[in-house]
């Protein structure tokens, strides 16, 4: 099984775009526990964003994005996630934007790797009024490590457009990075970086790339609840200037742990 997973990782690396402001999260390697489900609500409000319709895509300025995510642990190292994306703008009202499916596999603990390692593949549809990519595939390797109170995670994400406004010349490179420190027993503070460099064979010009930095708080050591929240600041003209995100999750264990 070990070699099949490694081969799958190698193949996926040769395919796939950054998260838009619907699900803003740097993944950890741990999959959802077997026979348990986590119900998550991602609430992201754009205080300062795009104000014009660009390539048929509606503005993000003062948009409220609510995403429902449901993830179930199938085995000790495999989970399946479902997303429902919604958008509210005062001039357009409330809209359902699309849905995604995301299977994820994690390396077994018995391998005793020095880092956590998992791989997710996310595929789905978004309305052309809210995304330049109507059908897309995302491959997300996840590498993380805990050193006592310090935590770091790297998601060197690749995205491929299956259908969209314009043809995509190559997979897009969209890395995500998280670093945090547990200043308190149950609370950590840290930073999250979200990038979108553009196609691998020809990165976008620097002002056209997406780069954002979030200052975040995480709830720790709670088997039932997950909380991640904080403001994000766009670092380039192509990135929304100010977004505030709140992620609240509730785990349900269908059988005794």
Residue ranges and their predicted role:
Residues 18-257:
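Transmembrane beta-barrel domains of Gram-negative outer membranes and organellar outer membranes
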């Amino acid at each position: 099984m070990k070699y099949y997973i490694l081969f799958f990782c190698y193949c996926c690396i040769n395919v796939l775009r950054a998260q838009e402001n619907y699900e803003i999260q740097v993944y950890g390697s741990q999959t959802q526990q077997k026979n348990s489900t986590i119900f998550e609500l991602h609430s992201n409000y754009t205080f300062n964003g795009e104000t014009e319709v660009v390539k048929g895509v509606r503005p993000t300025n003062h948009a409220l994005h609510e995403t429902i995510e449901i993830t179930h642990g199938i085995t000790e190292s495999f989970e399946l996630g479902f997303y429902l994306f919604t958008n509210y703008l005062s001039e357009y009202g409330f809209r359902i934007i699309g849905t995604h499916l995301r299977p994820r596999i994690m390396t077994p603990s018995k391998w005793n790797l020095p880092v956590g390692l998992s791989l997710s593949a996310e595929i789905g549809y978004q309305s052309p009024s809210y995304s330049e990519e109507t059908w897309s595939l995302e491959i997300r390797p996840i590498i993380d490590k805990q050193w006592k109170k310090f935590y770091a995670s790297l998601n060197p994400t690749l995205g491929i457009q299956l259908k969209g406004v314009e043809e995509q010349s190559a997979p897009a490179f969209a890395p995500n990075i998280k670093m945090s420190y547990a200043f308190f027993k149950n609370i950590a503070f840290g930073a999250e970086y979200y990038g979108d460099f553009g196609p691998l064979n020809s990165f976008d010009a620097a002002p056209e790339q997406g780069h954002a930095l979030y200052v975040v708080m995480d709830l720790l050591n709670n088997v039932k609840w997950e909380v991640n929240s904080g403001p994000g600041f766009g670092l380039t003209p192509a990135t929304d200037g100010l977004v505030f995100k709140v992620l609240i999750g509730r785990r349900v264990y269908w059988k005794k742990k």
